[in-house]
């Protein structure tokens, strides 16, 4: 009797799809409801809606590079997403410490790729600030990428520590 293989973590791509859906829904709302470059307070002294656009990457990196960066960041995001999806296919379904952050990064990366291909830029709209110190505007896809990257780093450290201890 042959053993049934463990199911892969590809089911976690449903979380990626959820991130993509929420990201695109929120950006559609922003484009139809918020004025450009105008702060709309959500929590005074901390949080605004602020519709802006980013042709670069994190913190507007390469935003003034002349247009080639759209294709560079699209290819980079698709390559990373493909690699993470491959890793998901090699990960056991129940190993959520790997699957969850991979799925978040995939969903966020693809959400921003959709923007780049549809609009030529990424739509950002969440603005956090304290006093005169303002964090660069971001979106749901960015939040998923950062959360996933933190998860990969933190859970990777814990997994290595656990393996070394045993």
UniProtKB/Swiss-Prot annotation:
One of its GO terms (cellular component) is plasma membrane. Pathway: Protein modification; lipoprotein biosynthesis (signal peptide cleavage). It is found in: Cell inner membrane. It holds the Pfam family Peptidase_A8. Its main location: membrane. It comes from the Bacteria. Its EC number is 3.4.23.36. The active site is at 124, 142. The chain crosses the membrane at residues 10-30, 68-88, 94-114, 138-158. It is an enzyme of class 3 (hydrolase). InterPro entries: Peptidase_A8. One of its GO terms (biological process) is proteolysis. It catalyses: Release of signal peptides from bacterial membrane prolipoproteins. Hydrolyzes -Xaa-Yaa-Zaa-|-(S,diacylglyceryl)Cys-, in which Xaa is hydrophobic (preferably Leu), and Yaa (Ala or Ser) and Zaa (Gly or Ala) have small, neutral side chains. Keywords: Aspartyl protease, Cell inner membrane, Cell membrane, Hydrolase, Membrane, Protease, Transmembrane, Transmembrane helix. One of its GO terms (molecular function) is aspartic-type endopeptidase activity. It is a multi-pass membrane protein. This protein specifically catalyzes the removal of signal peptides from prolipoproteins. Belongs to the peptidase A8 family. This is Lipoprotein signal peptidase. It comes from Xanthomonas oryzae pv. oryzae (strain KACC10331 / KXO85).
């Amino acid at each position: 009797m042959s053993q049934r293989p463990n199911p892969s973590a590809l089911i976690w791509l449903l979380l990626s799809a959820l991130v993509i859906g929420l990201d695109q829904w929120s950006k559609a709302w922003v484009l139809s409801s918020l004025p450009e470059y105008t702060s709309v307070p959500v929590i005074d002294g901390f949080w605004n809606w602020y519709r802006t656009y980013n042709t670069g990457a994190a913190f507007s990196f390469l935003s003034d590079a002349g247009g080639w960066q759209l294709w560079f960041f699209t290819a980079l995001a698709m390559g990373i997403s493909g690699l993470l999806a491959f890793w998901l296919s090699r990960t056991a379904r129940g190993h959520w410490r790997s699957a969850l952050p991979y799925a978040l990064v995939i969903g966020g990366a693809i959400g921003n790729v959709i923007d780049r291909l549809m609009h030529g830029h990424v739509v950002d709209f969440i603005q956090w600030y304290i006093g005169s110190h303002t964090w660069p505007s971001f979106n749901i896809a960015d939040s998923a990428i950062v959360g996933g990257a933190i998860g990969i780093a933190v859970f990777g450290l814990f997994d290595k520590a656990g393996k070394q201890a045993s």
